[in-house]
Curated annotation (Swiss-Prot):
Major subcellular site: secreted
One Pfam family it belongs to: IL10
Cross-referenced SUPFAM superfamilies: 4-helical cytokines
Family annotation (Gene3D superfamilies): 1.20.1250.10
Protein name: Interleukin-10
Entry's transmembrane regions: none
Higher taxonomy: Eukaryota, Metazoa, Chordata, Craniata, Vertebrata
Oligomer and partners: Homodimer. Interacts with IL10RA and IL10RB.
GO biological process: antigen processing and presentation of exogenous peptide antigen via MHC class II; immune response; interleukin-10-mediated signaling pathway; negative regulation of B cell proliferation; negative regulation of cytokine production involved in immune response; negative regulation of inflammatory response; negative regulation of interleukin-6 production; negative regulation of membrane protein ectodomain proteolysis
Transmembrane helix is among the record's keywords: no
Protein's organism: Canis lupus familiaris (Dog)
Locations listed in the record: Secreted
Signal peptide limits: 1-19
GO cellular component: extracellular region; extracellular space
Family: Belongs to the IL-10 family.
Length: 181
């Protein structure tokens, strides 16, 4: 019995190691498949934004730009991962909830846009693609965006939503750069 129990333990251990190696391979495969879905996800974001774009751009009467070149530079730098994460969080938690309340006709469209952004965020987190989100530092450019947004008060929502297409372009730039690494 002692020998068969030892053999059984060894088989269980080997099965566990094999399963964990298979799981690791699946996670790595999922990671490598993420970039293939990027164009589709960006198209969905752009289509969802297209449903509210005119509304917010018509209401945005300000000449200044909220999403500046310094934010794009952070997206291109080693802080790109954090800048992307912080900007997604900013739009989901600060901008979109306020934008939904501006007109009942656009509420569902803004909500749909938010769901698409959440899907992107979930894909980044659940896949644990460290190649795409490898760092933990804070982005100064994102802090500047948030500060400018706050100073604009009610007009900040129009400004941030009217520039959402710029944000999508920055996401695309960041992800395209990361795929090449």
């Amino acid at each position: 019995m002692h020998g068969s129990a030892l053999l059984c333990c060894c088989l269980v251990l080997l099965a566990g190691v094999g399963a964990s190696r298979h799981q690791s391979t699946l996670l790595e495969d999922d990671c490598t498949h993420f970039p293939a879905s990027l164009p589709h996800m960006l198209r969905e974001l752009r289509a969802a934004f297209g449903r509210v774009k005119i509304f917010f751009q018509m209401k945005d009467k300000l000449d200044n730009i909220l999403l500046t070149g310094s934010l794009l530079e952070d997206f291109k730098s080693y802080l790109g991962c954090q800048a992307l994460s912080e900007m997604i969080q900013f739009y989901l938690e600060e901008v979109m909830p306020r934008a939904e309340n501006h007109d009942p006709d656009i509420k569902n469209h803004v909500n749909s846009l938010g769901e698409k952004l959440k899907t992107l965020r979930l894909r980044l987190r659940l896949r644990r693609c460290h190649r795409f989100l490898p760092c933990e530092n804070k982005s100064k450019a994102v802090e500047q965006v948030k500060s400018a947004f706050s100073k604009l008060q009610e007009k900040g929502v129009y400004k941030a939503m009217s520039e959402f297409d710029i944000f999508i372009n920055y996401i695309e730039t960041y992800m395209t750069m990361r795929m090449k690494i």
